């Protein structure tokens, strides 16, 4: 069996509690602020400063609008012909400004295009001009639809309170 050391008998002075320690702990706890949650309720000045760091387009009314991605302004092009190439899309969209990036997804099984493309412009004006100029236009004999890749949702401040759906009827017990 292992030897058991009784702390109260041998060397009890090493483990003695400091009487003043309790008072200092209470003083520290009184000065500390009690905080809950994430971010600890940062002041409004910090939030507005953070919002100013990002590019955005002024929003008219309550409609959702375009939002800039980290890299640039991305357009989502649907209805692209399955045999279209990156050069075909670059030729068509390059008329409206310098294209930063084009992304085409291919179907692994067939090797053809999946029917959509992502076209990225550096500036909002170029992306808007391309969207307005090419939405509904033909690309390789098929009409394409052009819209923003990222959009802002509706404003958060105008939510109505309460339930959004009606409740299901109570189950009958037999």
Curated annotation (Swiss-Prot):
InterPro entries: Nucleotide-bd_a/b_plait_sf (IPR012677), RBD_domain_sf (IPR035979), RNA-bd_8 (IPR008111), RRM_dom (IPR000504), RRM_RBM8 (IPR033744). Residues 1-70, 149-174 are annotated as: Disordered. Keywords: Cytoplasm, mRNA processing, mRNA splicing, mRNA transport, Nonsense-mediated mRNA decay, Nucleus, RNA-binding, Spliceosome, Translation regulation, Transport. GO terms for biological process: mRNA splicing, via spliceosome; mRNA transport; nuclear-transcribed mRNA catabolic process, nonsense-mediated decay; regulation of alternative mRNA splicing, via spliceosome; regulation of translation; RNA splicing. Residues 28-38, 155-174 have a biased composition (Basic residues). Signal peptide: none annotated. GO terms for molecular function: mRNA binding. Coiled coil: none annotated. One of its GO terms (cellular component) is nuclear speck. It holds the Pfam family RRM_1. Residues 1-11, 44-54 have a biased composition (Basic and acidic residues). It is found in: Nucleus; Nucleus speckle; Cytoplasm. Residues 73-151 form the RRM domain. Required for pre-mRNA splicing as component of the spliceosome. Core component of the splicing-dependent multiprotein exon junction complex (EJC) deposited at splice junctions on mRNAs. The EJC is a dynamic structure consisting of core proteins and several peripheral nuclear and cytoplasmic associated factors that join the complex only transiently either during EJC assembly or during subsequent mRNA metabolism. Part of the mRNA splicing-dependent exon junction complex (EJC) complex; the core complex contains casc3, eif4a3, magoh, and rbm8a. Identified in the spliceosome C complex. Associates with polysomes. Belongs to the RBM8A family. This is RNA-binding protein 8A-B. It comes from Xenopus laevis. The gene is rbm8a-b.
